[in-house]
Every structure is written in C-alpha cells, then in structure tokens.
C-alpha cells in the first residue's frame, strides 16, 4: 500500500525505480480502461512494451515473470478520502488471470464505501480475493456504518461506462470526464525525446489556438519591468 496525502504533488525517482508502474495502476482505475494506449510511454518503452497483463504477471526487464505459469487473482484499488464530508470510498478493478491467458478475459471494476478492509483484500490464506469474494465484501458494505456517502457506490459494474459515471458523478462530485483525463495526463511525464522545451509545451500547457507560452513570457516580462521600477 502506498500513501499519498493532501500536499503530495511530486512523484519522483531514479530511472527504472517503478514510477511509471504506479502511475499506470492509478490511470487504469481513474480511466476505467485496461487498454495499453492509456499506459505511460516511458523513455525505454521501445524495449519494454507495457500492458496491464504484463504488469499483473510481474514482467521483468530480462523477459521473466514473477507469476509465470500460474492462475492468480489481483486488484488495483484507490482509497479516496473526502476532506469535506470526512467520507472514505474505494474504487478499483479486480482481475482473475489464467496461466494460459494471452489477454485479460475476466475482470470487473468496482467501488465500495469505507476504507480498504483490514485484510487488504486477502483471504485467511493470504490469497487475493476472487471476484466472487469481492462481491461479498461489497454486499457487506451496503449495510455497514461506512455507507454514508452521496449515492450508491457499493457495486460491481457491468460496464466501463457505468463505473465511470459513478466515479466522476457520485464519488468525485460531477467532474467533467474529458477535462479530468486531460489534466491527469498533463501531470504525468511522458516522453522527453524532443527536448525539455518541447516536452513542456506538449504536456504542461493545454493545446489551444493561442500561443500560451508567448503569452506567459510576455506576462513575466511585464512583471519584471514592474518589479524593477
């Protein structure tokens, strides 16, 4: 479990330390998609073709896998705390992967009221919940004192659209999906192969008809003139 608190706004580390892995996991949950097109394009992406399945199997740079040749279950979960209402809600996705699967066939997005359970989605034997096991947890949370949010969040969703509607409307408080994705993408370092200047233009300033960089430069110049007077 990794903790990100209110004032954490920088996620950094050495190359290969796993920054992209964490950000990709967050993006899967926020976008409701397991498509490789949503994953972070890292500097070494030509050598390491990322996919959610390769992540789940624990792909290593030498081509080996931590979970090769075995059936397993796994979850990616975000625990969200509303500082206004003091309500915690969890959103995520659960997977069941077969040892011979060449793509992800069985998975479901879910949400539930309250914090991550004390067992951290593990059975008494230390095995991650199956989708059926997760369904039981969600059903229990319906009658729990934790269920005090704005709407019905204790659900396993039949579609990506149903999941995202609950996440953006009920849990996040009517966030516009397109803007959410644009801003979140702008917060993630993708490629810097064209130099720092082009990277800043592409990913730190939203595209518009106006020359945003020139406008900001003019404003900074005017500010310096005022300061020097």
Pin down the residues of each PLM region.
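Extended, Lys/Glu-rich alpha-helical coiled-coil stalks
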Residues: 127-229
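Extreme N-terminal "head/tail" segments of very large remodeling/mechanoenzyme assemblies
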Residues: 1-138
